[in-house]
Amino acid sequence: MRLKVAVLGSTRGTALQGILDEVAAGTLDVELVLVASDKQTAPILERASNYGIRAKFVDPSGLKRETYDGIVTDALREAGAELVLLIGYMRIVSPQFVETWHGRLLNVHPSLLPAFAGLMNQRVHEAVLAAGVSETGCTIHQVTEEVDGGPIVLQKRCSVLPDDTPETLKNRVQALEQAAFVDVLRKWSA
C-alpha cells in the first residue's frame, strides 16, 4: 500500500514540484492525498490542482492557532494522511498539532540547521550571505515544539558562490529541497 502524504504550504510550493514530477513519472510510490494552505491565493494550491491533487484553502481568519490546527487535522485525517510535509508553510503549528502528528510531521528549512534557525524564506538567504559562510543547503527535520529544533532527517549542501544574491542562492537551495523531499519519501515509502 502506498504511503499517503499531505502537504501544508503558504507560498509557491516549489519543493512540492519534485514530488509531483516523480509521482507523475511513476518513480515515487506515494499518494498525495491533500495539499492545504492558509492562503487562498497560494500558488501551491494551483500547483497541486494542475496534477489532480485535492487542494484546500483553510481560512485562519479570526481563529486561535489551536482551533485552526484542529480544523487542519480534521482535513488531514479525512484525506487519510499518514505523513504531513510542511513546504513553505508560514505558520508555527500548535503543540497539540505537533503531538497529534508526532513522528509523521516533516518540515523543510532553507539552511543547514542549526545554522540560521528561526528565519524564514528570503531572510535565511540574506543572513547566509551576510555571514559570509562558504556553504549552505537545506534541512528536512521532524517538527517539534521547538521551531526548527526537531531531529534532522536529511541535509543537502551547496556552495555559496562569490557572486550569489539572495535570489540565486534561494533558487539553488530550492532545487536541493525538491531532491531532499524525494529522497526522504523514497526511504519512508520503502
Describe the function of each predicted region.
Residues 1-190:
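One-carbon transfer enzymes
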